[in-house]
Amino acid sequence: IALDTLLRTTHHQGIAAEVEDPPYASLEDALRLAASRKEPPLLVALDGVTDPRNYGAMIRSALALGAHGVVSEERRAAPLSPLALKASAGAALKLPVVKVKNLPRTLKALKEEGLWVYGLDVRGEKAPWELDYARPLVLVVGSEGEGMRRLVRETCDELFRIPIREEAESLNASVALGIAL
């Protein structure tokens, strides 16, 4: 009962730890990780993903499926909160998680460094499995409710969409990322 009170939840399996907030990484950290693995960089950029459960699940999928980092804006994304950390199942402590001030500007800078920027969007004509993952790239995913902002979408070299049944309307953002990776 004491642990339930301290944590304000019963979902703890009898274990708790007090830890410092994890530090955010830099883009250079993510690019160094790719270089150390002798792989072309694969970054995931999240535009407006504010739900901490989705944010954590997306970090987890990014780690599991070979991405070298997850990038999002400081003001338009969920923080690495305890809920996001829990949803990431520890992935946020193993993969560079980067916060930037301006996502469109960051994507343009990455393009100048030789990375291709691809977005998941209903306007896309190709499916994500047609992506060339052998080239250095950033895969951009927008929020469930809004999708990518116009400036982010316009920065993309190409848009891809996941073909789904019309009656489904949309996918959860973390599920869409998992399918695309």
Question: Residue locations for each model-derived region?
Answer:
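Post-transcriptional modification and biogenesis factors for structured RNAs
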Residues: 1-181
